[in-house]
UniProtKB/Swiss-Prot annotation:
This is Large ribosomal subunit protein uL11. SMART domains: RL11. It comes from Petrotoga mobilis (strain DSM 10674 / SJ95). GO terms for molecular function: large ribosomal subunit rRNA binding; structural constituent of ribosome. The lineage of its organism: Bacteria, Thermotogati, Thermotogota, Thermotogae, Petrotogales. It comes from the Bacteria. Forms part of the ribosomal stalk which helps the ribosome interact with GTP-bound translation factors.
């Protein structure tokens, strides 16, 4: 018989650096999940992407077991990384804090394609370009 799903918990964690401290502890501890087991499995699965912020979807079952799916990094994280910035603009419509090339935009769209609601690469590029604009980052040709 299949396990009964208790809850799906969504977190954003730095790859290879999950610890039982917040945010992992409070989010999973209330469902009785073995925190060290989750941290070891997550860190092992994401060790090759160290330093990257990754969304993770953790399915917790009634018997306190779990499975998790690691998604691609958020578009805003990838855009900031491509532009070499720590954060976006305070007033995006008024100030430009950085620029990225169309080639970088295409690479980000290819990376995010599986998680985006887009049928083709051009649509994905438009979504990522909108994210960049909302952060005060211009797209160069």
């Amino acid at each position: 018989m299949a396990k009964k799903l208790l809850r799906v918990v969504k977190l954003q964690l730095e790859a290879g650096k999950a610890t039982p401290a917040p945010p992992v502890g409070p989010a999973l501890g209330q469902y009785g999940v073995n925190l060290m087991e989750f941290c070891k499995k997550f860190n092992a699965a994401t060790a090759d992407q160290a330093g990257t912020l990754l969304p993770v979807e953790i399915s917790v079952f009634e018997d306190r077991s779990f499975t998790f799916i690691v998604k691609t990094p958020p578009a805003s994280f990838l855009v900031k990384k491509a532009a070499g910035l720590k954060s976006g603009a305070k007033e995006p419509s008024k100030e430009v804090v950085g620029k990225i090339k169309r080639k970088q935009l295409r690479e980000i769209a290819e990376t995010k394609m599986q998680d985006l609601n887009a049928k083709d690469l051009d649509a994905a590029m438009k979504i990522i370009a909108g994210t960049a604009r909302s952060m005060g980052i211009e797209i160069e040709d």
